[in-house]
């Protein structure tokens, strides 16, 4: 049964946190696994956060039926998907088409990022730096260390790290294969997305189409939700332009939410099976108000310091962390609950964990445990 959405212009329907949770999980392919291809899923989700090499594979395993990691690896090898810095200055796995459109959309944010490094770039002509770096990486993909040394030869008084950050911000650089491939990753080597794909990037697009796609994957959502996800500013006018095509709701705090008229909004009581998400899954990062997935009491509890861990969704909400260790041929998956779990929840989590270990590791034996490995210092 779908959630009720009766409303008037003066009194939009209020969507509860559970209603938002179920709607978002459905669109994120986490309420039930989808039969879509890996490439279609990467496009539907507007990319997979990929600052580490393995999480994109686990993101797709959590969302797709019969997912084979080699499918995504083959897409990388054929250059149908690429690893490129886009949203929130973070490396993402995108389809080739999205890499050529989303990067221009967020380019202004990447250039604003350079202000943080202006002291280390004193005396550096940024236009010339971009030209020099582009010539270097188009000649052949360059490891980061080599690119840094080449740039430092031109600007010996500049901060070496700031020079490579500037190249990354000014140019749409991709990490070429074998980096990021399943089971056979290599060092980071960079070239431009246009050179790697053999076609030019698109002109800077209007955000309208991206807003609609975002709502299809993360909605219902507010203007601020979109801005946090994309790291864009001044997009309220875009939502106003799209308003005649959208439905509007309110959350329990009174914040206006926008949504596609035909998007799924399941009944809040719809069962949500346990799902194991890797570190930095965009589900957990794609909104300004993350309480639709992360209970307030668990904010910031998917890691300690700079170390992030996987998140377990239990009844649709982040209520446990997980990690995998190897002991010889045994894969040991430890789940640390953040609340008391009933027997049925533990059984369902154990079953899902065992399936994941079978599909995503080459271990001959699996051991699923409930225990404590994170000390939050409470």
Regions found by a protein language model. Give the residues of each.
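Long, low-complexity intrinsically disordered regions
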Residues: 1-290, 296-378
């Amino acid at each position: 049964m779908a959630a009720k959405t009766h409303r008037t212009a003066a009194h939009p329907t209020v969507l509860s946190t559970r209603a938002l949770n179920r709607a978002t999980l459905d669109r994120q392919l986490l309420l039930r696994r989808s039969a879509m291809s890996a490439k279609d899923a990467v496009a539907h989700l507007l990319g997979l956060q990929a600052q580490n090499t393995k999480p994109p594979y686990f993101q797709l395993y959590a969302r797709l039926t019969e997912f084979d990691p080699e499918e995504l690896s083959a897409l990388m090898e054929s250059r149908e998907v690429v690893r490129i810095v886009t949203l929130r200055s973070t490396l993402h796995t995108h389809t080739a088409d999205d890499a050529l459109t989303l990067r221009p959309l967020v380019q202004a944010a990447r250039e604003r990022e350079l202000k943080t490094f202006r002291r280390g770039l004193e005396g550096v002509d940024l236009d010339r730096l971009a030209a020099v770096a582009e010539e270097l990486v188009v000649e052949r993909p360059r490891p980061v260390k080599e690119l840094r040394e080449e740039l430092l030869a031109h600007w010996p008084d500049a901060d070496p790290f700031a020079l490579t950050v500037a190249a990354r911000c000014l140019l749409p650089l991709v990490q070429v294969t074998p980096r990021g491939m399943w089971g056979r990753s290599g060092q980071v080597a960079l070239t431009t997305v246009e050179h790697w794909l053999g076609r030019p990037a698109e002109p800077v697009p209007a955000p309208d189409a991206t807003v609609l796609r975002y709502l299809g994957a993360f909605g219902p959502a507010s203007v601020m939700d979109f801005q946090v996800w994309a790291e864009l500013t001044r997009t309220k006018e875009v939502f106003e332009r799209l308003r005649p095509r959208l439905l509007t709701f309110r959350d329990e705090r009174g914040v206006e939410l926008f949504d596609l008229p035909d998007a799924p909004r399941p009944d809040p009581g719809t069962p949500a099976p346990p799902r194991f998400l890797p570190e930095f899954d965009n589900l957990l990062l794609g909104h300004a108000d993350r309480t639709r997935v992360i209970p307030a009491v668990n904010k910031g509890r998917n890691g300690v310091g700079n170390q992030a861990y996987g998140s377990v969704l239990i009844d649709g909400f982040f209520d446990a962390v997980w990690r995998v260790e190897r002991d010889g041929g045994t894969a040991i998956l430890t789940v640390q609950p953040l609340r008391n779990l009933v027997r049925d929840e533990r059984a369902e989590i154990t079953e899902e964990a065992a399936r994941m270990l079978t599909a995503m590791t080459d271990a001959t034996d699996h051991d699923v445990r409930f225990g404590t490995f994170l000390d939050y210092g409470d």
